[in-house]
Amino acid sequence: MQAQIMNKIFEIFSKNNPKPQTELIYKNDFTLLVAVILSARATDISVNLATKHLFETYNTPEKFLELGEEGLKKYIKSIGLFNSKAKNIIALCQILIKNYQTSIPNNFKELVKLPGVGRKTANVVLNCLFAMPTMAVDTHVFRVSKRIGLAKGNTAAIVEKELLQIIDEKWLTYAHHWLILHGRYICKARKPGCNICPIKEYCEYYINTFSS
């Protein structure tokens, strides 16, 4: 995709939603990290429902250790992979207290050392908490970026690299939020809403599918 077209796409995203934010609901830095871990293979809606009451009482690593693994499971049992997620989160709390004085690390290498934190989770945390220009590639970002022509890769890691190369730095702080929201509400997997899409004239899928 040409840089000029890429810029047109993100100009439209920026005009329609200047400062998009994560739809995960959280109380502080720690609860955002927990929410992002829980969101793996789960929807933000399901995570928010599970954490609504959890975060009201338990919102620090110390309080999570008081709750314990079995106690945590009771709150998050509606979320996929809740057993392994509970185990990882409790282990993560111990490490945060011991090594980081309960603070969340602000660099990628330290974050991915934490239990339950992979590349995507680390990138989300760095972006949302520290405003770093990272590119967290989830299923929405992966699908949308390939469909509209921003990337061609067949893995999340390759797509991430492609997006960081093509997207102008001025857009990167919000780029993954725009792509996620576009995929969640307009460019859906099974039935993309091309009729309401604000960027369709620049989208490779739309041009190839509907242009005569």
From Swiss-Prot:
<comment type="function">
    <text>DNA repair enzyme that has both DNA N-glycosylase activity and AP-lyase activity. The DNA N-glycosylase activity releases various damaged pyrimidines from DNA by cleaving the N-glycosidic bond, leaving an AP (apurinic/apyrimidinic) site. The AP-lyase activity cleaves the phosphodiester bond 3' to the AP site by a beta-elimination, leaving a 3'-terminal unsaturated sugar and a product with a terminal 5'-phosphate.</text>
</comment>
<dbReference type="GO" id="GO:0003677">
    <property type="term" value="F:DNA binding"/>
</dbReference>
<dbReference type="InterPro" id="IPR004035">
    <property type="entry name" value="Endouclease-III_FeS-bd_BS"/>
</dbReference>
<dbReference type="Pfam" id="PF00633">
    <property type="entry name" value="HHH"/>
</dbReference>
<dbReference type="InterPro" id="IPR023170">
    <property type="entry name" value="HhH_base_excis_C"/>
</dbReference>
<feature type="binding site">
    <location>
        <position position="187"/>
    </location>
    <ligand>
        <name>[4Fe-4S] cluster</name>
    </ligand>
</feature>
<dbReference type="GO" id="GO:0006285">
    <property type="term" value="P:base-excision repair, AP site formation"/>
</dbReference>
<dbReference type="Pfam" id="PF00730">
    <property type="entry name" value="HhH-GPD"/>
</dbReference>
<feature type="binding site">
    <location>
        <position position="194"/>
    </location>
    <ligand>
        <name>[4Fe-4S] cluster</name>
    </ligand>
</feature>
<keyword id="KW-0479">Metal-binding</keyword>
<dbReference type="GO" id="GO:0019104">
    <property type="term" value="F:DNA N-glycosylase activity"/>
</dbReference>
<dbReference type="GO" id="GO:0051539">
    <property type="term" value="F:4 iron, 4 sulfur cluster binding"/>
</dbReference>
<dbReference type="GO" id="GO:0046872">
    <property type="term" value="F:metal ion binding"/>
</dbReference>
<keyword id="KW-0234">DNA repair</keyword>
<keyword id="KW-0227">DNA damage</keyword>
<keyword id="KW-0378">Hydrolase</keyword>
<dbReference type="InterPro" id="IPR004036">
    <property type="entry name" value="Endonuclease-III-like_CS2"/>
</dbReference>
<keyword id="KW-0411">Iron-sulfur</keyword>
<comment type="similarity">
    <text>Belongs to the Nth/MutY family.</text>
</comment>
<dbReference type="InterPro" id="IPR011257">
    <property type="entry name" value="DNA_glycosylase"/>
</dbReference>
<dbReference type="InterPro" id="IPR003651">
    <property type="entry name" value="Endonuclease3_FeS-loop_motif"/>
</dbReference>
<feature type="domain" description="HhH">
    <location>
        <begin position="108"/>
        <end position="127"/>
    </location>
</feature>
<dbReference type="Pfam" id="PF10576">
    <property type="entry name" value="EndIII_4Fe-2S"/>
</dbReference>
<keyword id="KW-0456">Lyase</keyword>
<feature type="binding site">
    <location>
        <position position="197"/>
    </location>
    <ligand>
        <name>[4Fe-4S] cluster</name>
    </ligand>
</feature>
<keyword id="KW-0238">DNA-binding</keyword>
<keyword id="KW-0004">4Fe-4S</keyword>
<keyword id="KW-0326">Glycosidase</keyword>
<protein>
    <recommendedName>
        <fullName>Endonuclease III</fullName>
        <ecNumber>4.2.99.18</ecNumber>
    </recommendedName>
</protein>
<keyword id="KW-0408">Iron</keyword>
<feature type="binding site">
    <location>
        <position position="203"/>
    </location>
    <ligand>
        <name>[4Fe-4S] cluster</name>
    </ligand>
</feature>
<dbReference type="GO" id="GO:0140078">
    <property type="term" value="F:class I DNA-(apurinic or apyrimidinic site) endonuclease activity"/>
</dbReference>
<dbReference type="InterPro" id="IPR003265">
    <property type="entry name" value="HhH-GPD_domain"/>
</dbReference>
<dbReference type="InterPro" id="IPR005759">
    <property type="entry name" value="Nth"/>
</dbReference>
<dbReference type="InterPro" id="IPR000445">
    <property type="entry name" value="HhH_motif"/>
</dbReference>
